[in-house]
Amino acid sequence: MEKVMLAIGKFKEGEGHFEKFMSFMQSEEGMAERRKVAHVEKTVPGILPDKSGVMFKVHVHDEQAMKEFVSGRNPAMKPIYDECVESIQLFELSEVDIG
């Protein structure tokens, strides 16, 4: 079952963490790992103006793997997580009828 989630990440202090993180996420390895947990073509990104953090609206098809991915427990994600990420929060989203 597909679940829509919001991941909000904060980077460690210092220069270049945003660029390094995004470079990994857009690399072949990063894209392959993302495809294992979510539909990457449906992902909607957002960036804080000072590049100290990011958020992604993600359509997840493997919730447990997503939790491992954003927590740094995924072996492919761990090195970039350890170097660049201070924290990531994960939220479940549900659509609200405004009509």
What does each model-identified segment do?
Residues M1-A76, S87-G99:
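Short S/T/G/P-rich N-terminal loop/turn motif that feeds into the first structured element of a domain
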